[in-house]
Amino acid sequence: MANTKKYFLESVSPLEYAQKKFQGNLRSVNWNLVDDEKDLEVWNRITQNFWLPEKIPVSNDIPSWKQLSKEWQDLITKTFTGLTLLDTIQATIGDIKQIDYALTDHEQVIYANFAFMVGVHARSYGTIFSTLCTSEQITEAHEWVVKTESLQKRAKALIPYYTGKDPLKSKVAAALMPGFLLYGGFYLPFYLSSRKQLPNTSDIIRLILRDKVIHNYYSGYKFQRKVEKMSKEKQAEMKRFVFDLMYELIELEKAYLKELYEGFGIVEDAIKFSIYNAGKFLQNLGYDSPFTEEETRIKPEIFAQLSARADENHDFFSGNGSSYVMGISEETEDKDWDF
């Protein structure tokens, strides 16, 4: 093993080369020499789960969409545009910055993959819009995002930590976006799906959620590996930071959800759904959830939406119990193209 790693110790990754003022000989990522087996495990999972929104038959939701009032249509469009903003931030700043702070060469490329898939998530909402919404509805929703202060505050809150000098705080912030902030928006499609509305759209959200679960798990794992090397004092300091930031975001989230969902009868349940996932996020970092059962009580029909057709072990690509459709190819002849 010593000889196997000799070249590794005498070289730098391309990222290290750029960070160290262009010093040293470059090495390539070697998937046959993995220091942390979790890297390989997560890489295999995220590549096995690869999907694209164009494969989901969202057009099957058009009849359901037309049955909704304009108020509900506008709410859905605003909610998904808000989610698009968060995924835009995560794809272009949050996950990209984690490459700089990676512990292994493999972690670098995993976060590059995460950034790409979050870009796919942002594109997915565009697929929903182009299928269900008018151009006017889409434009109005994007204008609403720019002008809505409660949304802007929560969207901007994590960016200073992404780009700051503390790698661990950046890691926490990058995990908070997919681990907590998105769930208030996720509540709406699950609520609708539990009432037999927009089922294919909800399937897209389940696929996004499946990716987020892996993302959160991996970021939490890497966070814990770094924290365990710190002194007790530093560990306590980091815990205070995590909880303080979480409570700050919860207040921002409550303000946003109250404004977004006002008049639709789902504000309190959406907040409980968010806080439930805040507790899950903290557990993922190795901390106990401080929230009570009452604060995190989710209705059974919403829990059913989280599990039905969305279990991480489910074969989304089989077409069984999911709307993910794979194309079937057929050889053609010249005459087939004579229209």
From Swiss-Prot:
Enzyme class name: oxidoreductase
Catalytic activity: a 2'-deoxyribonucleoside 5'-diphosphate + [thioredoxin]-disulfide + H2O = a ribonucleoside 5'-diphosphate + [thioredoxin]-dithiol
Active site (catalytic residues): 125
UniProt remark on cofactor binding: Binds 2 iron ions per subunit.
Cofactors that this protein relies on: Fe cation
Gene Ontology process terms (BP): deoxyribonucleotide biosynthetic process
Residues reported to bind Fe cation 1: 87, 121
GO molecular function, one term: ribonucleoside-diphosphate reductase activity, thioredoxin disulfide as acceptor
GO cellular component: ribonucleoside-diphosphate reductase complex
Coiled coil: none
Residues that coordinate or bind Fe cation 2: 215
Domain of life assignment: Bacteria
Keywords of this entry: Deoxyribonucleotide synthesis, Iron, Metal-binding, Oxidoreductase
Enzyme nomenclature, EC number: 1.17.4.1
Similarity field: Belongs to the ribonucleoside diphosphate reductase small chain family.
Known role: Provides the precursors necessary for DNA synthesis. Catalyzes the biosynthesis of deoxyribonucleotides from the corresponding ribonucleotides.
Oligomeric form and interacting partners: Tetramer of two alpha and two beta subunits.
Protein name: Ribonucleoside-diphosphate reductase subunit beta
Source organism phylogeny: Bacteria, Bacillati, Mycoplasmatota, Mycoplasmoidales, Mycoplasmoidaceae
